From Swiss-Prot:
This is Ciliary microtubule inner protein 4. Residues 35-49, 89-100, 127-143 have a biased composition (Polar residues). It comes from Homo sapiens. Residues 1-147 are annotated as: Disordered. It is found in: Cytoplasmic vesicle, Secretory vesicle, Acrosome; Cell projection, Cilium, Flagellum. Seems to be associated with spermiogenesis but is not essential for sperm development and male fertility. PANTHER family: TESTIS-EXPRESSED PROTEIN 33 (PTHR31702:SF2). It comes from the Eukaryota. Keywords: Cell projection, Cilium, Cytoplasmic vesicle, Flagellum. The keyword Membrane does not apply. The gene is CIMIP4.
Length: 280
């Protein structure tokens, strides 16, 4: 039993080693198939158009389509199969050739994308032509800021070129007249001759402190407040409601004030006159 078990173990280990050697022999073939599969996926990724994002513009989509259409297909995958059985020197040569071919493909794709770019430049040129002012507005007298503010159609309907020219001519004529007027600065001799009468007056007259010569003034107090006013006065008793006094009552008040003022003045000036006479 022990020998058989030992023999069994030896056979098992030999079989296990044989399986490992077979797996090592199969590993390079698996690597080759995996490299072929990856190259296929890469080629498929290059040939299939990628979806554009939602926010991309129409111009970007057109450029992307042009690039995708004009990119030539990559070289066949047979080269990758042959590369497995070649030396490292031959592999380096193949890689250099593939790099040069990829550069040529990029150059051809860039040249093919130029007509697509030309199509995008078309609308921009048209927009510039539209933004440019028309020929009839280039030689117009009306400035562009007024046309922009009120609208070119409204300005053309309401104002003509002749009216604008007339208004501008009137402004220029007014400026010429203002410049042709004599300067207001005059010689001091002329000023003295013009204002000689004014300077002949005194300071009080020139300052307008009083207006003219003095005149005799007479008080109308005694002439207005006479007994005739009391005789001619009539009180309307029917329309006396809510009144405290009337014209007659006002007259009596003023008359009493006048009498009191006269008495006070007589007392004051009478005492002063008596004192002066006593001194002398």
């Amino acid at each position: 039993m022990e020998l058989g078990h030992g023999a069994g173990t030896t056979t098992f280990t030999r079989a296990h080693l044989n399986d490992k050697e077979g797996q090592q022999d199969l590993d390079p073939w698996k690597a080759a198939y995996s490299s072929l599969d990856t190259s296929k996926f890469k080629n498929q990724g290059l040939s299939s158009p990628q979806p554009l994002p939602l926010g991309a513009s129409a111009q970007g989509s057109s450029l992307g389509q042009c690039h995708l259409k004009e990119i030539p297909p990559p070289p066949p995958t047979a080269a990758s199969r042959d590369s497995l059985g070649m030396d490292p020197q031959s592999r380096s040569l193949k890689n250099a050739g593939s790099r040069s071919s990829s550069r040529e493909n990029r150059a051809t794709s860039g040249e093919g994308a130029q007509p697509c770019q030309g199509t995008d430049d078309g609308p921009s040129l048209g927009a510039q032509d539209q933004r440019s002012t028309p020929t009839n507005q280039k030689g117009s007298i009306i400035p562009n800021n007024i046309r922009h503010k009120f609208g070119s159609n409204v300005v053309d309907q309401l104002v003509s070129e002749e009216q604008a020219q007339k208004a501008i001519d009137e402004v220029f004529e007014g400026q010429k007249r203002a410049s042709s007027w004599p300067s207001r600065t005059q010689n001091p001799v002329e000023i003295s001759s013009v204002f000689s009468d004014y300077y002949d007056l005194g300071y009080n007259m020139r300052s307008n402190l009083f207006r003219g010569a003095a005149e005799e003034t007479k008080s109308l107090m005694k002439a207005s407040y006479t007994p005739e006013v009391i005789e001619k006065s009539v009180r309307d008793l029917e329309h006396w409601h809510g009144r405290k006094t009337d014209d007659l009552g006002r007259w009596h008040q003023k008359n009493a004030m006048n009498l009191n003022l006269q008495k006070a003045l007589e007392e004051k000036y009478g005492e002063n006159s008596k004192s002066k006479s006593s001194k002398y």
